[in-house]
Amino acid sequence: MSQWQNICKIDDILPGTGVCALSGGEQVAIFRPYHSDQVFAISNIDPFFEASVLSRGLIAEHQGELWVASPLKKQRFRLSDGLCMEDEQFSVKHYDARVKDGVVQLRG
């Protein structure tokens, strides 16, 4: 079973934004959509352009699903599993994320 890795304090991520962190040599985009301890983590790499930009995307909710729009061409990636909502042939890696004692953790 994989261990949980401490990444940052939850207060380091403003509600409605994302940040990029390095975990196991991979860039991970961590999102805090609301003013709560709920966090999501997906790869920071936009698969259409191979650019490290997803943590700077816009977070939105549509039909009950949270997603982030890439800042480049606005393709949307579902935060729950990394699936591209415009083209299901594309997806980004999803990471298990949680907040424990005020610290954001990723399973790795």
Swiss-Prot record:
Keywords associated with the record: Cytoplasm, NAD, Nitrate assimilation, Oxidoreductase
UniProt keyword annotation of Methyltransferase present: no
GO biological process: nitrate assimilation
UniProt-listed InterPro entries: NirD (IPR017881), Rieske-like_NirD (IPR012748), Rieske_2Fe-2S_sf (IPR036922)
Record bears the keyword Transmembrane: no
The protein's Enzyme Commission number: 1.7.1.15
GO CC annotation terms, alphabetical: cytoplasm; nitrite reductase complex [NAD(P)H]
Catalytic activity reported: NH4(+) + 3 NAD(+) + 2 H2O = nitrite + 3 NADH + 5 H(+)
PROSITE patterns for the chain: NIRD
Subcellular location: Cytoplasm
A matching Pfam family: Rieske_2
GO molecular function: 2 iron, 2 sulfur cluster binding; nitrite reductase NADH activity
Signal peptide (UniProt feature, chain positions): none
Function: Required for activity of the reductase.
NCBIfam families in UniProt: nirD_assim_sml, PRK09511.1
Subunit structure as annotated in this protein's UniProt entry: Associates with NirB.
Name of the protein this chain belongs to: Nitrite reductase (NADH) small subunit
Species the sequence originates in: Salmonella typhimurium (strain LT2 / SGSC1412 / ATCC 700720)
